[in-house]
Amino acid sequence: MNDFVGPIVTVLTAIIGVAILAVLVSRNSNTAGVIKAGSGGFSSMLGTALSPVTGGTGFAMTNNYSGF
């Protein structure tokens, strides 16, 4: 079974890699905006996860989507 699944996973991974590369180098992509939004979301999740240890509230107000 591994002889069958391995090549399929390799091909699918290559297709996904090419798609990601195409999006990153496209003129119409907003790569910087996507990276900024992703890092802001990660920062918020990390702050929430560490809040019991650090004594924080767990709600980071660093992004533009917080309506508080």
UniProtKB/Swiss-Prot annotation:
Asked if the keyword Zinc belongs to this entry, the reply reads no
Query: Which keywords, in A-to-Z order, does the entry hold?
Result: Capsid inner membrane protein, Membrane, Transmembrane, Transmembrane helix, Virion
Spell out the subcellular localization from the entry. Virion membrane
Disulfide bonds, which pairs? none
Q: What GO CC annotations are associated with the protein? A: membrane; viral inner membrane; virion membrane
- Record's keyword annotation contains Membrane: yes
Q: Where are the transmembrane segments?
A: 4-24, 41-61
Its placement in the membrane is given as: Multi-pass membrane protein
* Subcellular location, principal: virion
Reading the lineage from the top rank, the first entry is Viruses
What is the recorded name of this protein?
Protein P34
